[in-house]
Amino acid sequence: MNEFPKFKQADYPKLYLEQTDKDLVKILDPNFRYAYFKTIAKGGKSLIRSCKDLHLGRVVCYKSLLPEFADDPIEQKRLLREARVSAMLQHPNTMPTYELGRDRQGHCYFTMKLVHGYTFREIINYRERYDVTQLLDILIQVAYALEYAHTHGVVHRDIKPENILIGPFGEVLLLDW
């Protein structure tokens, strides 16, 4: 049976005291908070990128609408709803939202925890055989997230393997609320 690839040490940079003891600038300009963008994934209407949060010194996941949808008020509302629902669902199997804002062009975005993981689809496509216990564990964790969401009146309308992320520590995260 094939082993799933391990994560690289480079994905987790070391911390140094001089990075944590920097003074905070007098005026925090949200338009200059994020830099070093790198595309991770492209969805039907949105773009997912990693970038550096210059205020907190960490790499985050930055989600925004594709240019052709960025000015559409209906799509903006959907993106805002997704960000707020994700932020309100405080559960180990949901992705935490860090910030919601607008860029220099006035387009909506939100940032989330960046997890160096694989989607359930990637795992299914990679392996020839599966450990049923591991698959059940993934599905149970998804069920926990759904149960939590349902008790808060939230229904996930797009459950599919591409929206389930497995992190390097075995954590299972349900995405795209």
Stretches with model-predicted labels:
Residues 37-43, 48:
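Protein kinase glycine-rich loop
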Residues 120-130:
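AlphaC helix of the protein kinase catalytic domain
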Residues 138-139:
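Activation segment signature within eukaryotic-like protein kinase domains
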Residues 144-154:
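Protein kinase catalytic-loop region centered on the HRD/HxD motif
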Residues 66-88:
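AlphaC helix of the eukaryotic protein kinase fold
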Residues 105-119:
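Conserved short submotifs of the Hanks-type protein kinase catalytic core
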Residues 52-59:
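Conserved N-lobe loop of protein kinases adjacent to the ATP-binding glycine-rich P-loop
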Residues 99-101:
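A short, aromatic-enriched beta-strand patch in the conserved N-lobe beta-sheet
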